[in-house]
Curated annotation (Swiss-Prot):
Residues 73-126 are annotated as: Domain II. GO terms for biological process: DNA replication; DNA replication initiation; regulation of DNA replication. Domain I is involved in oligomerization and binding regulators, domain II is flexibile and of varying length in different bacteria, domain III forms the AAA+ region, while domain IV binds dsDNA. This is Chromosomal replication initiator protein DnaA. Residues 127-349 are annotated as: Domain III, AAA+ region. SMART domains: AAA (SM00382), Bac_DnaA_C (SM00760). One of its GO terms (molecular function) is ATP hydrolysis activity. It comes from Bradyrhizobium diazoefficiens (strain JCM 10833 / BCRC 13528 / IAM 13628 / NBRC 14792 / USDA 110). Residues 89-122 are annotated as: Disordered. It is found in: Cytoplasm. Oligomerizes as a right-handed, spiral filament on DNA at oriC. CDD domains: AAA, Bac_DnaA_C.
Amino acid sequence: MNTSEQDRWSRVKGRLRSSVGEDIYTSWFARMDLEDVQDESVRLSVPTRFLKSWIQAHYAERVLSCWQAEMPEVHRIDLTVRSAVRPVAPPKEAPAPVETRRAPAPELRSTATAPVSANHDALGGSPLDPRLTFASFVIGRSNTLAHAAARQVAEGRRGDPVMFNPLYIHAGVGLGKTHLLQAVTWAGNSGNERKVLYLTAEKFMYGFVAALKTQTALAFKEALRGIDVLVIDDLQFLQGKSTQAEFCHTLNALIDAGRQVVIAADRPPSDLESLDDRVRSRLAGGLVVEMGSLGEELRHGILKSRVAAARAHHATFDVPEEVLHYLARTITHNGRDLEGAINRLLAHSKLNNQPVTLEMAEREVRDLVRPQEPKRIKIEDIQRVVARQYNVSRSDLLSSRRTANVVRPRQVAMYLAKTLTLRSLPEIGRRFGGRDHTTVLHAVRKIEALVSKDTALSEEVESLKRQLQE
């Protein structure tokens, strides 16, 4: 892809983001890539068939119109699924079939890329990447708690009391959620004691729908509920009322039986608006951990880890420290961009038989160096910071209390939610204890009027904004 095409693609993505909103863009379009541009057609790719089907069914016209705003001659968008080429271990010999009167559940066999225990082999699941283990996970300030909680789950034994259930990890794209979930699965399946199953939400949906079609839903449910540790990735993609109901039943059954559930998504439970309230409530009742953005020190550590991994197969490959610092300082979006940068330098160095230099790095990764995006502020962050500022609790802000020491902080928090987020008035009201949108509008207008004439309050509000934007 040349520079002009990359620039055009960036503008199209900006139009698409503005058109559908930040949340929808992150859920459905963040992993969409540009593959090719012809005279009247554009070829895009996504990592899964589910994403392809969903975008084609719900957003095809929107994507086309965004392209036509940049290239009026484009009349067709071709959406393809990227292939993830990984070596697959030879399949093990299948055990002898056992007679049963009940039809078998739809197969959920994992295409694992390294040897796993018999338990994992029998249970199956979504494909696992052998690189995504605890040994290769780089720990930093933004992921320490998530890593510790995941290790605690992975090191548990059958019959041990379950401390965090469910363990719910949320973060943006490329910040390490899937790495931790697969690390839990690899570690849990390293022995023969527990049954650990890793599934994407997409695989869960396909499995359940297939079970309904083949009239094996009961066997499907029993197979899932026999798991010791159920690991579900990308929960934001769970769609359909019947599928969500089954997921809720499975979640409740496993937790009530003392089995561990680990879940990852790109947002906290309260933001999964497509999910039933019962599911969100159960998810919020466990340990909810956010993995924050990667700081420069952590990015540097990830880069060094990726160089070391590459050197295991290419002994002469080396990246000077000044190049690592440059990459860590300028590639700030996510860990996948960092890994992509190392892969580019490796390819360029090996194919051209040249050492890696700072000049080469600046040239090869320039499209990964993105303008610093403004911090995405969440309503939960606003409530937390305001509660701390005014020495009240978050539950006070959400309560029906009308005392002066609670009403003013609540109004300030609602005002900040309206001015610093893209949430609608009804949504803000729901986040503040189920209040009506008119209550939010009154609070916003009240604070707007006060800050224009109350210097002290104006300074307080500006201080809160700075704290939230840091």
